[in-house]
Each structure stands twice: as C-alpha cells, then as structure tokens.
Amino acid sequence: MRDTPLSNCERLFLLKAIKEKKRLDGRQTYDYRNIKISFGTDYGCCVVELGKTRVLSQVSCELVPPKDSRPTEGIVFFNLELSPMASPAFEPNRQSELLVTLNRQLERCLRNSKCIDTESLCVVSGEKVWQIRVDVHVLNHDGNLMDAASIAAISALSHFRRPDVAIQGRDVTVFGPEERDPIPLSIYHMPICVSFAFFLQGSFLLVDPCEREERVKDGLLVIAMNKHREICSIQSSGGIMLLKEQVLRCSKIASVKVSEITELINKALENDKKVRKEGGKFGFAESMPKERITTLKRDEAPVEMTDVKETADDIVQRTETTTETVPSPILVATGTAQIGEGIVNSWGLDEDEDDELQTEDRKTDEVVVITDSEEEEVVILNDQKSKKTSKQK
C-alpha cells in the first residue's frame, strides 16, 4: 500500500483543529457523515455512501457440498477488495495489511456473531447446502471503510433472495424467479461496526473519522453491536492504551449510532419492497441525482389573467358569422319555380365598376379629328374604290 505523504503543515493544522473540537467538514465530535443506502435491480446488490466513501456489496449463492465438520449447515463467505479505482494508495493484485484486517474484521462481525441462520441453508444433509458469498468492493476511499463495508454487507444480505428448491428422492430441483418466488435469508440481528479514532495519546476522540483524520490518529477502536445493545466484537489497533471508562463511553455512543443506522436500513428495505410491489422504477439509476445544465434556463414570465374572459368574448363576437337569409323557391307553374323574389339583387355591379363603364362609353362617343399629318400615315386597304374616285375627279 502506497501512502500519500502528508505535509507537516496539514498534520499540525488537523491536530490543532481537533484540540479545538473542530473538524474539516464542520461536524461535531460524535456526528456521522450522511449515509445513503440504495439497492440495485437484482436482489442482494447494495451501494452505501458514507460521505464520499462508497462501497458496493453483491450477494450470490450456489449449491455446494457441506463441510465435513458441519454437514447440516450452509456456508457464508466474505470477500473484500481494494482496487486502485478507490484510491491511488491501493496496489492491484497485492494483499496489504489493511485488506487482511478488514476481511478478518468483517468475518468476525457478521459470520462469528451468528447473525445468519446457517441451518436454514441446508438442502440435503451431508450432500447439498447453499453457499452464500458476499463480495464487497470499495469504490471510493474517504475514510472509515469498516463501517461502510459492514452496513453494505448486512444490507445486501437482508435484501437478498435465494431460489426455492424441491427435493424428490435424491433429485434437487432449483426453481427460477418466474416459477416460484425467491426466499429471503433468515437473519436474527444486524451487527454494525462503529469506529472511534483517538488522538494525542487518547486525549481526544472522534466518531467516523475521514481519510485525513485517519492519517494523524494514534489509535482506532471498532465496536460491532446490534440494536439490542449486544456487543458482537471489539478490536483495538494502533498500540494505544485505553482506560475502562473510555471503552464504556464508546460502547454507549455505539449503541445510539447502531440503533439509528438499523432504522435507516429497515426504512430503505421497506421503500424498495414497496416500489417493487407497486411496479415503479427502482435501481441505482433512480437513486442517483440528475445533474442538468441550467445556464440557459429562463424564468417564467408573469401572465395577467384578469381581462382574459372579456377579450375572449370580444374575439368570439367578431368571428361570429352573420346569418344569411336564404329565399324559399316560389312555384309558378308545374315544373317552373322562381327563386330570389323580394331580395335585393346582389348580381349587379358595384358603383366603381358603373363609373368605369360610363367613362368608357363617353370616350367612344367623342368625335376624333384627324390632322394632315395623320392622313399621310393612313394606309388604304381597298385599291379599286380609290381608282374610281380619282377618275370622277
């Protein structure tokens, strides 16, 4: 694991802020960061966001032979992975001390606490049992990976559904979700880890430390507890000596935090179950906030609606068509009818057209006087008549 160096100025600034009971993100000493739990479209897929720390948990199952020491119990397997995508400090394909510690702590919290009924996972004693595999992937590391991993793992186990089976003799039939409804796991309680970081030789205490606060810590205490105030595991690291009063104080704080987180998990499970039952949209895509560009957004212009009715009435009155009187035919004789008697004749010409016709008639009645110049330009069409007139002269 390649640790990113922390400058002395940053270290001194963090320790000075902790002495003054201040934190980088504005939280109080015992405050958790915002926790968001969302489930995928498939059962057993869960993403937990603890501030900027993001963890994905996926649960799967398969039929395997049981262990020789426990032929009537199923198998629960946990696997936690740290990829360079989460932090540049994580090296690929190499088990670091942090990875081994997190895996052991997760198994001690969930498997050794007997929170899952492993006997209900037995299909055929000594032959077939269900193996439940929990894969936890760290998507982004911003401190307190243990708490986020425990919340994601127990939420995914509570959300998971295994296929139903039928046994006829030695034949085992596994039904798909279309044939029979999947069966949820039998979970007795929900153990959740709560981390406490100690600074300056145990003089100061912080709950849910972030990544920078973890770099300057002197010791770490992780308490796994359920909402019934039952301690499932306790682990201390860092080589710091803690007093009995400090441990009891941390356990009281952990009981309050665990009850709040358990209520949040149950609420998220109920909401997902309700949405699936109603046939609504569910999955990671619906839980992610939609970020849209709002630079070109225009504010709605105010519209006055006071005189709308009056103007509408005026428009209707203007556009109303005038009722035309249609004459009824008058029967003059057999086979002859007269239409339009007693109505003004609309076939006549307009006054302007009458004026134009009168002016044209006046122009045609006028006498045209032809001058000498115009006589020379006259073309004679009949040659014979012109010859006779010349002889008489």
From Swiss-Prot:
SUPFAM superfamilies: Ribonuclease PH domain 2-like, Ribosomal protein S5 domain 2-like
This protein's record includes keyword Signal: no
Keywords: Cytoplasm, Exosome, Nucleus, RNA-binding, rRNA processing
A Gene Ontology BP annotation from the UniProt entry: rRNA catabolic process
Superkingdom, taxonomy of origin: Eukaryota
Disruption phenotype: Morpholino knockdown of the protein affects brain and neuromuscular development. Morphant embryos have small heads, small or absent eyes, truncated bodies, and reduced and damaged myofibers. Motor axons fail to migrate properly to the neuromuscular junctions. The brain has abnormal morphology, the cerebellum and hindbrain are absent.
Lipid biosynthesis is among the record's keywords: no
One Gene Ontology molecular-function label: mRNA 3'-UTR AU-rich region binding
Subcellular location: Cytoplasm; Nucleus; Nucleus, Nucleolus; Nucleus, Nucleoplasm
Main location: cytoplasm
GO CC entries: cytoplasmic exosome (RNase complex); nuclear exosome (RNase complex); nucleolus; nucleoplasm
Region spans: ARE binding: 1-268
Pfam family, one: RNase_PH_C
Function according to Swiss-Prot or TrEMBL: Non-catalytic component of the RNA exosome complex which has 3'->5' exoribonuclease activity and participates in a multitude of cellular RNA processing and degradation events. In the nucleus, the RNA exosome complex is involved in proper maturation of stable RNA species such as rRNA, snRNA and snoRNA, in the elimination of RNA processing by-products and non-coding 'pervasive' transcripts, such as antisense RNA species and promoter-upstream transcripts (PROMPTs), and of mRNAs with processing defects, thereby limiting or excluding their export to the cytoplasm.
Subunit annotation: Component of the RNA exosome complex.
UniProt family annotation: Belongs to the RNase PH family.
Name of protein: Exosome complex component RRP45
Protein species of origin: Danio rerio
Lineage: Eukaryota, Metazoa, Chordata, Craniata, Vertebrata
Gene, per the UniProt record: exosc9
